[in-house]
Amino acid sequence: MEKLLAQLIRLYLMPGQATGQHPAATPLVSDDGLTRAIVIDFPRAAGDESGHWAQLCEVANTLQEKLGFPAPAVSVTGADAFRLWLSLREPVPVADVRRFLSLLRSAWFPELPLHASSTVELPPCLHGATGKWAAFIHPGMGASFAGEEGLDIAPPAAAQLAFLEGLESIAPAQFEEALAAMHRPRETAPPQAPLAAPPDGLLLKDATLEDIVRHLHAMGIEPSFRHVLPGRA
């Protein structure tokens, strides 16, 4: 767990920020209003089990395709939502994060709220109300969690670590350029060059179980997904 905590500190927590003993007590914003994380919730809507996953994929793909950001982390909350985790290499004022999300909504997602959390439960942790586990997940598995965004049993620490070790943070210049690009009038923005092939981090389609097992085996990890599927009648 120490290695996993080190990755959470590397990617998302402010210097000197204590994680505490209770997962619900982890702040992402320092006392002077700075943050290194943009964590966006995508809650499940009533009567729509998969729409929030599609929304997360659209936002994640746009951030990478249009703004050139590195691949984000994805988690389930143990309740009824997915989370998208963006890491900033250097702290920025919370006001800049709000401005970034406001510009992102205006540019591509006017129908989505896209609010950043200031306090968050650090996966893996047990959700007190549901008894399900919050956990980081392989992006290709997201659709399989739609409608039941949690794990029945604690996830393997090695797999959680593997999902974070290869992630990169958004550089200060990337963040500033993204703000500038979204602030420019749409008609004067430079055209985006077409991508020859989707980068590895994109969430354009769901990976098969075999893809995920192969990915974890390549890292020397024996997978144990620990998600109990409901029995068939």
Predicted regions and their residues:
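DNA replication initiation modules
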Residues: 29-48, 90-227
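Generic detector of isolated residues embedded in canonical secondary-structure elements
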Residues: 81-83, 215
